[in-house]
Every structure is written in C-alpha cells, then in structure tokens.
Regions:
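An alpha-helical interface "stripe"
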Residues: 1-170
Length: 170
C-alpha cells in the first residue's frame, strides 16, 4: 500500500470540494484574504462598499471573543454608508445556506508572532470558517492539534483577526 504525501492529499481534497461546488481560490496571505472578503461580501450582499465602508465592516468583525464572533456570523451589521443611508450587512445566510458563497484555498501564510502556513481553509462568504490540517500517514494526530494550537497562539489574531472566525478544525 502506497502512502500519499500531504500535498497529494491536499490536492485530492480540494478536487473533491470543487466537485461539491466550492470555488477554488488562490489566497497567498492576509492582504489577499481581506481583499477576497471584501469581494465576497459585496457579491453576497449585492452591493459595492467604499474603502471607508469596508473599513467599518472590518472594525466590526475584529471585535469580540470567539463566542461573540459566532453570533456576529448570524447577525446583521448596520452600516452607515458614506451617503448617510443605512445598509444591513449580512455575513451568513442561515435560512438558505445554498445562497452562501463557498470557497476553498490552501497554503495561506499569515504572519503574527511567527509566520504560519495553513493547509486547507474553507471560506463562506469570504470568512474562514473551517481549517483542515492534513498530516501524512505515520504522523501522530497529536501533531495536527499542536500545530493548530500554535496557529491560534501565534497568528489567528493577525490581519483583522479573521481566522478567529474559524468554527471547526479538522
């Protein structure tokens, strides 16, 4: 029986997710993650945000602990647009999940206290909600747990803390 490398396993997983209607997207770093979030939220909410408006959204998303962030996903954010009108930004459609935008990316590098690179990340409406840490055969599962703990400690808070929205580790 041959063993798959982590890269082979990663590519196979991504291919399966694409078959489940996830869009593959290349996100190299935190700046690209934020840029992708803006474009996905614009498509999802059917609106274009100015830089100032999107900064207000990022500020809102950066607040709270992990439990408050889970609540933020389900709530709407009242954004005061530059023209003075209000718009309610949605982050997740809980009533009809088929309306959400699903993406898969791999090898995102974030730099906090240390530089970390994440194996496979699932994004919903641009927010990273699932983190998958792959390990080749022969390594103990404990290695993946240790790695996720390092990520949480060293870089999940970087780039507006978007990785603090991760709801599930696999």
């Amino acid at each position: 029986m041959s063993h798959q490398s982590e890269l082979q396993l990663e590519n196979k997983l991504i291919k399966q997710l694409i078959g489940l209607n996830y869009a593959a997207v290349q996100i190299q770093d935190g700046d690209a993650l934020v840029s992708n979030l803006k474009s996905q939220l614009e498509v999802f909410n059917q609106i274009t945000f100015t830089a100032k408006e999107f900064d207000a959204i990022l500020n809102h998303l950066s607040k709270g602990n992990v439990f408050e962030k889970a609540k933020t996903l389900r709530d709407r954010f009242q954004l005061t647009k530059e023209d003075g009108t209000s718009f309610y930004v949605r982050f997740f459609n809980t009533e009809d999940t088929s309306q959400n935008l699903y993406q898969v990316t791999n090898q995102i590098s974030l730099e906090g206290s240390y530089k970390n690179r994440y194996d496979v990340t699932l994004l919903v409406n641009g927010l990273p909600l699932v983190q998958i840490e792959l390990k080749r055969s022969g390594l103990e599962i404990k290695e993946a747990f240790n790695q996720i703990n390092r990520y949480q400690k060293h870089s999940f808070w970087s780039n507006d803390g978007l990785f603090q929205y991760v709801q599930l580790f696999v």
